[in-house]
Amino acid sequence: MRLLLIFTVIFVFYLAILKRDVNAQQQGIDSEEGDAETFFNRTYSAHQSDLEKRIFRGYDIKKRPVKNASVPTVVDVHWHVIHVSINQKEQTMTLHGHIYMRWYDEYLVWDPKDFAGIHYARVKKWQVWQPKIRVSNSASGLASAFDFSTSAHVIIQMVEKDRAKVEMYPTFSIKVGCMFDFGDFPYDQNKCSVNLFATDTMAEVQLQNLYNIPPTLSFGWEEQKMKRIISDFKILNVSASQFYYGSGNVSKTAPVTGFELGNTWSMLAVNVDFVRHSPYFWSTIVAPTLVCTMFIQVSFFAPTVSLAFVINLMAIYLEFMFLQDITIKIPLYLSKRPSSITLFHILLISNIVSAVFHGVLCALCSTKVPVPLPIRKIYAVKDYVPASWKEEGMVVDYACDTNWTEWTRTARPLAGLAMFVYFVIMFILYLVVRI
């Protein structure tokens, strides 16, 4: 009985001691008395604060992040374009998106073991050294400070013992002047570029395209991510290129010697190729033109000359209405007259000539002026007309017929046939050769 009492006392005291040891081990993140999330965040925040104090102690944002001044800082650049806006009247293009820049900093280094294994630090853009970049063809001017956002987060990653990788991803909205040529309207195809350069020479800063990857395009979300049609234009391709400016010349060959590096600037370009997207051109311009052409043709086969003259006037009125629509749509800058406008002008002039022709005939038919002998030779055509087509009482001696009414009855169908052949040739040239 005494032995059982001793074992009971020992067992009770042992459980109390064991529970105390377990509670002592669970203090911290797994403690039942504290909030694990709050404890973890407070610790991470504290480590981040200590890390920023450490890496920015004595850091100079105006000094290039290399310990050897003779070594240039290489900045990798990648473009992410989310929208393109083209203004054909102002001859400008506006590019919106994000620009990714990456370089290595030899001063923003730390040992992750001293800061709870932290390998990343997120800081403000103004806290670190960054390359000074400008857009050479910016519509706001060469020294514009509004092309790139002034606020952007920077990620610092400790990748090596003696240097850290710095990544910056600011947004941009760049408006540049372009040289558009719409001489092939509505089949015109143009190209415009955004030229980026660093204000420091290549002896200090060198820009280059990240792994030669072309710009990323995201003009929409989900189903619209492959969208390429914006307003009146279709984006054909967006590419990136690199070239060098030095001694007043532009070259694609990189400099080699130290003297050349000290007098050359690296430049990057985003090239946007686009073509006009005009799906309604045929229905709004070509189709009405064909209708006017039919009016011209019908006028030559109208029963009376006066009716033909009225048809011509109506066609001229319609063409002037369509001409106003074309004038509104066509761009202002043209190196040559577009083939579509040339064709429309030909049809308009042909209609005016047809109206004058029928107007003169209408006036002559109401007079007793005889038909001049030279143009009476047109009656010879009737000799080739089948007998079944000839009307009763048709004059046999055409040389003696001086009646303008009879002459117009023969001349108008011939003129209409000649006009038809002329129109067919013009349309074929427009479709095949595009005058």
UniProtKB/Swiss-Prot annotation:
PROSITE patterns for this protein: NEUROTR_ION_CHANNEL
Bilayer disposition of the protein: Multi-pass membrane protein
GO BP term, pick one: response to caloric restriction
Superkingdom assignment: Eukaryota
Pfam families associated with the record: Neur_chan_LBD
Compartments where located: Cytoplasmic vesicle membrane
Cleaved signal peptide residues: 1-24
Glycosylation: residue positions: 41, 68, 237, 249, 403
GO cellular component terms, semicolon-separated: cytoplasmic vesicle membrane; neuron projection; plasma membrane; postsynapse; synapse; transmembrane transporter complex
MF annotations from Gene Ontology: excitatory extracellular ligand-gated monoatomic ion channel activity; transmembrane signaling receptor activity; transmitter-gated monoatomic ion channel activity involved in regulation of postsynaptic membrane potential
PANTHER family (UniProt xref): NEUROTRANSMITTER GATED ION CHANNEL
Function: Thought to regulate endocytosis in coelomocytes through modulation of phospholipase C activity. Possible acetylcholine receptor.
Name of the molecule in the record: Acetylcholine receptor-like protein cup-4
Upper lineage: Eukaryota, Metazoa, Ecdysozoa, Nematoda, Chromadorea
